[in-house]
Amino acid sequence: MKNLLFLFSFLLLVNCEDKQSKQQNPKVSKSKIEKKIGSKKDTIIKPEREFPLLTSENAMDFFLEYEKYNKESKVRLTTTFGNIDIQLFEKTKFHRANFIFLIKNKIFDGTQFHRVVKGFIIQGGNSDDRKVLKKRRDIGKYLLSPDTKRGFKHHRGVISVPSSDIENAYKLASPFEFFITQSNQYHLDGKYTVFGKVIKGMNIVDKINAQETDNGDWPVHNIYIKEAIIIE
């Protein structure tokens, strides 16, 4: 009888200790472990820039190298009124490279022909849209030196670069804007850089040039460059 009482007491003691052990050491479920492991924030790595932020100090060197590997020379501007196809001149390599670079980076998409002077020019590439301004900032702030001694004249239908609004010294050229002549404008020779000509769509240039404008030569109705693409 003594032995039975001893055995019963022993089993009771073991059972109590086992319950206490379970209470003190709760199980950690697999899902909780996985949750803890996955709770760390994913590290976001920003992609490296494909090109440097352009400045007046590095732009010419950049385009000298860029033009070696980007030989495209025919582009298309899709406008509110239709397409304008342009042949870029190989001799004005910095301006050709700049134009190709800007097209590949979608800088002209959504801009406007913001200045129209009847019988003279249509000027494009600008906009008051904040998205356009942001894209410009992402490219950089730089100027291109004029390249006016290649023998190209301001015949009807050439594409040329206006002097810069940033600094007008030496007629440095604004890289984000351009104009197309609607008629012969030889008084511009030697002052602005001709770097291409319209090969198809002069009727579209004429149509844009005929639009009504305000006192500042800005078209009353917006004329968009919906898209600029490379065709060859």
Regions found by a protein language model. Name each.
Residues M1-N25:
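Bacterial Sec-dependent N-terminal signal peptides
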Residues C16-E232:
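Cyclophilin-like peptidyl-prolyl cis-trans isomerases
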